[in-house]
Amino acid sequence: KINDYLESIKINVKDDLLDNVATISCNNDVKLGKIISEAYKSVGKDGVVLMEESETDETYTEIVDGVQIECGITSPHLITDTDKQRAVLENPLILIVASEIPNVRKIQNVLEHVIKQNRSLLIVAPVSQQVKAALIMNKVKGNIKVNIIDLPGFGPTTQETTKDLAILTGATVINEELGDDLDAISIDILGEAEKAVTDTKNTVITLDDITQDVEDRIDEVIK
C-alpha cells in the first residue's frame, strides 16, 4: 500500500522541472544547471551521468556507450586515483570467469599477453587470496595495470548479468559449473573496452561502439 501511495503522488522530473532541479543543485548557476539537465535528458532514465575534471577551461558533456554495474573496489591497493578513490583503466582487456581462479598459473598466459601488449586488465571474477596478493604486488611494483572486481548481480541474477557483460565487451565467460575448464582461459576469450572506472560502489565500463550483438541483446531485454 505504501508503494501504491508513493506511486500515486510521484512527480516525473522532466523538461523545465529538470532544468530547475539541476540549477538548484548547482547553487542557482543557470548555465551549469542547463548543462547537467541536458546530460540527463540525453542519456534517459536508464542512463548514468558522471562528473569529471575537465582537461580544458570548458565545461561540456560527452555521451559514451557503456554500462554501470554494482561492483566496487575490492582492495585499496588497486586504486589509481587516490583523490577520488577510484581505479581507472584505459583501454583495458577484460577477463570474465564465473568460477574462482585458484592460482596465478591459470591466468599466466593472459597476464603475459597484457604486459607484452602494454594494455591494462580488468578481471571480473572471484579470485583466491593468493591470486589477489600476487596481482596487487605486481600492480604496486608497476609491472602490470590491473583491477579486480566481483561478478555482477546477486544470486540467481549473477549468471544472466555476467552474460550481458560478456556480450557488451566481447568476452567469453569461463564457468566450471557449465562444464568449462579453467585451463581454457586464454587470450582468445578476452573482451575489451575503452575505459573502466571503479569506485567504492560501482564500475562503469565505456565502449568505443555498440556491436550488433549488444543491440540484439538490448532488443531482447526490452521485449
Predicted regions and their residues:
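Long, structured protein-protein interaction/assembly regions in large complexes
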Residues: 3-223
